[in-house]
């Protein structure tokens, strides 16, 4: 592990475990002595907590992993209310998703923390506005990329296409994680081995399905215990 520990986490799709992996990475980096914080350029989907405060479960997970108090610091410049494609919800809420604003927010955080884990939204090519997509932002940030593969039917094609897209932007793939979704897929280990044979980047580990006691309820972040469980099954990039 180098003295710099900054990563951009993307996934083969939405709901494949990017937040779980991002939180686990933050936990492991902080355990290794880094002053690490999580960041998301945009989120879509909010709920009201028991105190009537608007929250987003992904941001709350990153906050918990980063060891921050509620409302201590902003981890995202754009918080949209409806859980749908960010560019569509931004249009619906009359918001322009500006990559410059996202980069400025990221840079402000980087002045306070020596290690950033940036979690993307959805997949790698998700549009942000009429001109830019998430890949453009990742290219501008230029952090090594960690790919989360949600292990389900079709994931091999999705993973290999995403790797091609990442490499076409001249970005380094620091590693990839196999995340077992709630129902284990048939031939799970064989699928993981196929991906290991075809993805020319380090395999960081496979996260099994979370035990029932650690599964998060709807409209809630992952618990620190769930992040610790996931962290036990992955390695940090070297």
PLM-predicted stretches and their roles:
Residues 9:
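Hydrophobic anchor at the beta1->P-loop junction of P-loop NTPases
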Residues 102, 106-130:
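Switch II (G3) loop of P-loop NTPases
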Residues 40, 146-149, 174-180:
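Short internal beta-strands
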Residues 164-238:
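C-terminal lobe/tail of nucleotide-utilizing enzymes
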Residues 129-152:
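Inter-motif core of Ras-like GTPase G domains
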Residues 4-6, 20-96, 100, 107-108:
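N-terminal phosphate/diphosphate-binding loop that engages ATP/GTP or pyrophosphate donors
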């Amino acid at each position: 592990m180098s003295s710099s520990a900054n990563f951009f986490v993307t996934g083969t799709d939405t709901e494949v475990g990017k937040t779980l992996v991002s939180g686990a990475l933050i936990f492991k980096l902080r355990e290794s002595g880094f002053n690490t914080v999580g960041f998301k350029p945009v989120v879509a989907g909010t709920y009201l907590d028991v105190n009537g405060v608007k929250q987003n479960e992904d941001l709350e997970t990153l906050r918990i992993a980063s060891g921050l108090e509620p409302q201590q610091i902003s981890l995202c410049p754009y918080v949209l209310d409806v859980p749908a494609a960010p560019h569509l919800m931004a249009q619906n809420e009359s918001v322009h998703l500006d990559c410059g604003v996202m980069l400025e927010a990221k840079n402000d955080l980087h002045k306070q923390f020596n290690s950033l884990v940036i979690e993307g939204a959805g997949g790698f090519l998700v549009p942000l506005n009429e001109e830019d997509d998430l890949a453009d932002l990742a290219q501008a940030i230029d952090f090594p990329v960690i790919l989360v593969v949600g292990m389900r039917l079709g994931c091999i094609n999705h993973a290999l296409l995403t790797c091609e897209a990442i490499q076409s932007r001249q970005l380094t793939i620091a590693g990839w994680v196999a995340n077992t979704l709630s129902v284990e897929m048939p031939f799970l280990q064989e699928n993981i081995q196929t991906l290991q044979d075809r993805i020319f980047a380090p395999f960081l580990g496979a996260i099994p399905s979370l035990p029932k006691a650690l599964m998060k309820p709807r409209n809630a972040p992952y618990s620190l215990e769930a992040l610790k469980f996931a962290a036990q099954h992955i390695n940090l990039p070297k």
